[in-house]
From Swiss-Prot:
Similarity-based family: Belongs to the universal ribosomal protein uS9 family.
Identification of the protein by name: Small ribosomal subunit protein uS9
InterPro entries referenced in this protein's UniProt entry, alphabetically: Ribosomal_Su5_D2-typ_SF (IPR020568), Ribosomal_uS9 (IPR000754), Ribosomal_uS9_bac/plastid (IPR023035), Ribosomal_uS9_CS (IPR020574), Ribsml_uS5_D2-typ_fold_subgr (IPR014721)
One Gene Ontology molecular-function label: RNA binding
Provenance organism: Geotalea uraniireducens (strain Rf4) (Geobacter uraniireducens)
Keyword vocabulary terms for this entry: Ribonucleoprotein, Ribosomal protein
GO cellular component, one term: cytosolic small ribosomal subunit
Pfam families cross-referenced by the UniProt entry: Ribosomal_S9
GO biological process terms held by the UniProt record: translation
């Protein structure tokens, strides 16, 4: 029996996205809003759609997403990662294409912590010799 929906979890920076794909018309819903309502920037919308355009699945699935944490860029990246993982659940043959584009690998770069005795992670306070 084939599954009615496909699930994938995506992460980027401090954002976590849970993505469900269902066969449908191509409607993308993020936190109960349309993609256009949720993301103001065109680049964020483009990032979210990249795995679908690459695998030629645009308009074949209705996508429901819940995402939390981080900012716009991190959330868009997390959704992209989640959609990629859900597409792999749909068809494992897409793995080569998605891996080549670098969508399967989790981007592990996160914010470096602030150190004590310093202004930021690496920036020090101004130093005066005399």
């Amino acid at each position: 029996m084939a599954a009615a929906s496909f699930y994938g979890t995506g992460k980027r920076k401090s954002s976590i996205a849970r993505v469900w794909l269902k066969p449908g018309t191509g409607v993308i819903t993020v936190n109960h809003k349309t993609l256009d309502e949720y993301f103001g920037r065109e680049t964020s919308k483009m990032v979210v759609k990249q795995p679908l355009e690459l695998t030629e699945n645009m308009g074949k699935f209705d996508i429901y997403v819940t995402v939390c944490g981080g900012g716009d860029s991190g959330q868009a990246g997390a959704i992209k990662h989640g959609i990629t993982k859900a597409l792999l659940e749909v068809d494992a043959a897409l793995r080569g294409t998605l891996k080549k584009a670098g969508f399967v690998t989790r981007d592990s770069r996160i914010k470096e912590r602030k150190k004590y005795g310093k202004k930021a992670a690496r920036a020090s306070f101004q130093f005066s010799k005399r």
